[in-house]
Design a protein with these regions (language model features):
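Central hydrophobic cores of alpha-helical transmembrane segments
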Residues: 22-26, 156-165
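Long, hydrophobic alpha-helical segments
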Residues: 46-69, 91
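Terminal transmembrane helical anchor/hairpin motif
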Residues: 169-245, 249-253
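Short cytosolic juxtamembrane segments of multi-pass membrane proteins
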Residues: 255-260
Length: 260
């Protein structure tokens, strides 16, 4: 699996799209720091970009890589190599290269700007960690969708629909539920609903770390009371890890049972 991981990693790192992805974040970091001298405000702006863009890129790259490397994958399947090793190696290779492009692309401008001497270092570190988690999560979900659909058009459609649901539609349903059932105690419902969506969970963790939970109103107070504690932070971290582990398990399971 490690050899396939390394091959997929270097293959994607040589791709021009990886350079475009890296340069986009590099330029974004430079422009934000040029226009804004406050590192905390720059981190907030980056959060709004990363929360939406990183899942989208992870989803698209994951689906594209699977379908574009299908012939090479079929060649590997003819070799005495475990199926799960092939697809897990490809997944980790793609996700790792995307996460590195994100971390290095955003990290370089902030390092040269002096982020290590700023109090915003922990906020920025959390931003990069959640960005890496979202990359691994949505790349895994993309591989699950691609493995489940031989039709390329269907695979792309389902992948984009998944991203749209997680990033936009889920929030709309969540807010409508809060408004419709406002006469009922919704503290536990809000916490559970947030943890069931990695995008919302990442956003809440960053907002609480930036100490701007007041922007979320009453819900923000509930989140601060729970996620602001050590137990809440540990539980949310476990949930993010589970969001990586569960789709990865499905990749292994589908690859093992799928008839190629």
């Amino acid at each position: 699996m490690l050899k396939i991981l390394k091959y997929s990693f270097y293959d994607l790192m040589r791709s021009r799209w990886s350079y475009v992805y890296f340069l986009f974040y590099l330029l974004l970091g430079i422009v934000l720091l040029f226009l804004n001298n406050d590192l905390s405000k720059a981190v907030i702006t980056l959060m709004n970009v990363i929360i939406i863009l990183v899942p989208l890129i992870g989803t698209i790259f994951g689906v594209m890589y699977y379908y574009n490397s299908r012939e090479f994958t079929e060649l590997l399947l003819a070799q005495p190599i475990k199926r799960s090793s092939i697809f897990l190696g490809q997944y980790f290779g793609v996700a790792t290269s995307l996460a590195m492009s994100l971390i290095i692309g955003l990290g370089l401008p902030f390092v040269f700007y002096g982020i290590f001497n700023s109090s915003a270092i922990w906020d920025f570190s959390l931003l990069l960690v959640t960005g890496a988690f979202l990359t691994f999560i949505f790349t895994a979900l993309a591989f699950v969708i691609a493995l489940s659909n031989e039709n390329r058009i269907k695979g792309f459609g389902y992948a984009i629909l998944l991203w749209l649901f997680m990033a936009v539609i889920y929030d709309g349903i969540f807010l409508m539920s809060l408004l419709y059932f406002e006469d009922y105690p919704l503290d536990k419902f809000s916490l559970v609903a947030t943890m069931l969506n990695p995008v919302d969970l990442s956003r809440v963790l960053i907002l609480l770390k930036l100490d701007i939970s007041a922007l979320l109103g009453y819900t923000g107070a509930v989140f601060q009371k729970f996620f602001g504690t050590n137990f809440g932070l540990i539980l949310s971290s476990i949930m993010l890890v589970l969001w990586v582990v569960i789709p990865t398990f499905f990749i292994w399971r589908i690859a093992k049972k799928k008839d190629f």
